[in-house]
Amino acid sequence: MKKNNSPASLFGLKGLALAVLATAFGITSCKSDFDLDKRTPEWLGTSIFETMVNGFEGNEGQHYQFNTFVELIRALDKESNSTYESVLSRTGSKTLFIADDDAFKRFFADCPFKTASGEPARSIEELSHAQKLMILNGSMLNNVYQVAMLSSTPNPSGSGAPVTGNCMRRVSAASVYDSIPIIMPEDMPSNSEIWRGYKSKFPNGMVCFSDGTRRSMIFFVDKFLTSHKITDDDYDFLFNQGEGTGRPGRKPGEASINGVKIEYKDKKCFNGFIHVMSDVIYLLPSMAEYLEQDTENAYIYSHILDRFSCPVYSEGVQKEVLSRMEIPSTAETTQKVFVRQYFSLRSQGNAEFGKIPNSNDKPFKDNALLKFDPGWNEYYAESGSTEANIALQQNMGVMFVPTDATIKKWWLESPAGTSLRKRYGIAKYRNSAPVTYKEVAEDMDSIPEKVIVKLINNNMQGSLVNTVPSKFPNVLNDAQDPLFEGISDPETCFDSIVMCCNGAVYYTNTVFTPTAYRSVSYPALVNEYLQIINAAIEDVTLQFSAYLNSMQVTYSFFIPTAQSSDPNLNGKLVWLDPSSFAHRKNNPGQDYLEAMVFRYNTEKSKVEAEVCKYDPQTNKLLEVPTAATTVSDDVIQNRMRDILDYHIIIGNVEGSDVADADGYAYFPTKGRGTIRFKMGASAEDLDQMEVDGGYQIENANTANIKISVLERHDQTSDHGNGVTYIIDKPLLTSSKSVYDVLSDSAEYPEFYEFFNLMNNASGSDGKPIFVNKSNGNDIASKFNVGSFNTYHYTVYVPTNESIKALIDSGKIADPDKLTEFNDYWEGIKSDLADDPEGDLIWIDSMLDLSKRLTGVADSSFNYKAYYNRKRDELKNFVKYHIQDNSVIANAKFEAGYKDDGSPATIANYETAYMKTVGKNQQFVKLKVEGGKDIKITDVKGNTRNVLKQTGSKGHSLYNILCREYEFKVGTSAGDITDVSTAMIETSSYAVIHLIDGPLCNGEVDF
């Protein structure tokens, strides 16, 4: 790591023109306001001020003189009629971290404070009033602290001993109102629409505080460092010292303030303590302030941050300012007082600042919020105490800031930078690349906030304590993956560190590009016609952003565009809503379905939707969208989750080695549905690519159903995580349930016999396989499979011939015969109930019935037990053909791994059939071998094969995709009467295959 050996680099300030913090924008000082205790207990010794005047002996015989510090205090009192000397001479509670005269000589020899002419200040006289205050109040605490107690915080219980090793910051004696900053129009950010409005509104300048909250001093003592596992090497890294820097590293036992060593500690005075510092300390700026003024290294980065800031009128701050002094006449005569804030998830008061002031709660652009407000002086980490004052003391933030030279190189040469430049770079630099840093910043101005915020946020860390070199392996990026993965020595990425009052700026010589720029989600981020999907990805509740940004997984991501040649639909995404299947079912005369029509409202930065009628024959809307907002945010969020779950595939869909003869291969989606994909002759032949959802497959003969692949983006070319396909319409899941397919004897006569068993398999408990409600919720079809439970399944259907043979052999009962015999038995019971000769006739009837059913005449035959046993056997037989896990032919078979780490080729899957073993019940399994073909082995060792055939009506008899839904009406159970209020509560996916023979579960042997 490169180091800077300037004395000011103790603070990491590197000779920055700190005059800006004290004199720029016409800063004017305020009068002080103290409530003095005039009592002076003589037995406690001299006061702080008298001790400074007299000086004192150090531990090693050196004599400390503080004439310069005394001169500074008296100059302040003289300039503003303040009472600092009096305050420090009377009883009170103060702690001062002061520099002696020798330290001030070094300070003025290389002074970071500049005069009005831009020259370094060389004496107290040349310092402005505000600069003097920065030194005095920046080195003072309004309480009494010995060094041993600097790391202590109050006990969270409100009583008991303080918690030691818990504090690294305390609010200094500086007041927000020590100076009044006035910002002139020419100094307002030029790349912000909001600021441009204020330029014209306040031509004479406006009073605008950089934050409006108090600044802290930074403490590092042994107890804190050891408690938080921060090593001496970590400390040296933070303060640009140690090996290779020419400055000695930290020694055990040392304590420092703002990185400056305490040379002599705990000088007791009657009104507090004095600690002698090895160098002058002063009030530190916030990270945002520092970057704004470091035009040599951070011009571009600060220029980007400007776009996320705005002035916020503060009535409270204005009242406080006016109570102390008049606003200078150079400022706007309206005397409005503003505070600068940054649009962020966490700003002042730990509250989100995401609405543009005076805009009727209009969200900031696309809700592009920073992780935290870099100008928030009282920033504290989310993981800290629930009490803000304690949380502030425990931690602060970090910003990784690439230097201007680094950003320029990234913008002009890196894959991510050049991609952004190609898309967003301005015309004037199209043929001639920007040269100066100002030109680079200008060239980057057109990047939308929602895009550039990814870069900023990836380089913001919420905890300094957890972002030191010894903990670099645990620092994460925007995808929650290790940020420094693949970097052998992360420290080499940093040039220098700057300590600020609310965090540390780590200057980097590399750009930590957000994974969002390499992710399959990137096209959605930068394409205006994909804003609907991008908004769903960014939804913090849905949590797709981190999922899609993971670089540990390869994805194929299909994104439907909202671009359309139809002006009524351009910018809208039409999605056939599955709840409309239930709505149509509940209204038998209804011949249309309904679609959600989504659009992105740029003013509100949100997705809106309305419901329109949809023709399932033409696959077009039957009415023109009106832009009405008829669907709640909760329902939209519910649908967006469903859409994304079906458009994300884990793995590469191209070049499958299990595709069928026509080139089709099947792939599971994130939500465990299935899509079908056909590759073109090459990756560039988009017109030859085909992709279908379940609905597209089952309605292949209807108009306008085919999906076109419009674009292909290979994100792996920049070490990304997959391929993105832009498609012209959404993939749709199947509308059919297992019941819909199996019961359709006209289209699927090959399934008739098994359906007859399934439909009549109610067992002795009387609970059928098919149910017309699911957990009291409405369903999309007439019936669902009752055992399905938010998972994915396979239903194996033996051929009609094999079912008939099994029934003919007597292995399982014919349900029609069972019903016939049961009706006969019930009739006998009814007829003989009052017959005096009934017992004899009953015996004869039982002899006849037992002979017909078992082949043996038995007068004691227990028909009811026989009937129930056969019913259970029938139901268990059917349930054994319903398997957990969807297994698709012509799809990669994911069976896990063997003990030796090699891929398994066979998997054992549970079925819906459960048997009793001892006192327990367990699901009976099937052994399955998948891939291009599927083989199933039952518990008796019978091997069956999925028949890859086409039925007599032209339908495939394998890989039949189904989906079974549950819908709520809002949050309640009930029938769907309005698609706009229906919620997809849950669903299950299933695939149906015809197999060449029945599966034996062991209960009946065959």
Can you describe what each PLM-predicted range is?
Residues 15-16, 30-1006:
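Mature, structured domains of secreted/extracytosolic soluble proteins
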Residues 1-30:
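Sec-dependent bacterial lipoprotein signal peptides
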